[in-house]
């Protein structure tokens, strides 16, 4: 709460990776069907949305602008939607892999290990709808590359993280714009103008602009 009060006092947002440590319990993929069928340790959805819920309450109390990074659960989407409807300065972001994949796509391969993990099909569909209707305003890559060796130890032993910088736009264009879920203009807005607006960076491409 104190951090939000201080941020609000200087007109800056709080940006959060939402994760309740006590709920992780050593998990490394989504606590879903694949996890249980293959004997892995799961990360429950509550570990994300519980912090989103808490932080939104604090944002309401303090008047702080609040931005949620890499949203992956349908519950987080609904909390952000309600906060926006209540007029709070709350925004959210997700990443291409949460819009295009789910835990049904998992393989015994470290390339499928990231944090937050790939969630269930319902979460993916909720995120797609949220990006389409503007509840989730930003798509970012959460680009986190590792060496081939670091990603070669299977789901349990590989480092967390997925690459996305090079392929984010073409994948989103192919699987969201071409089928009609987003227009090209909306995709560009989610990936460029919206984050500039949220973080007070101005708009457009001009000399001297960040």
Predicted regions and their residues:
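Histidine/acidic residue-rich metal-binding segments in metalloenzymes
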Residues: 1-139
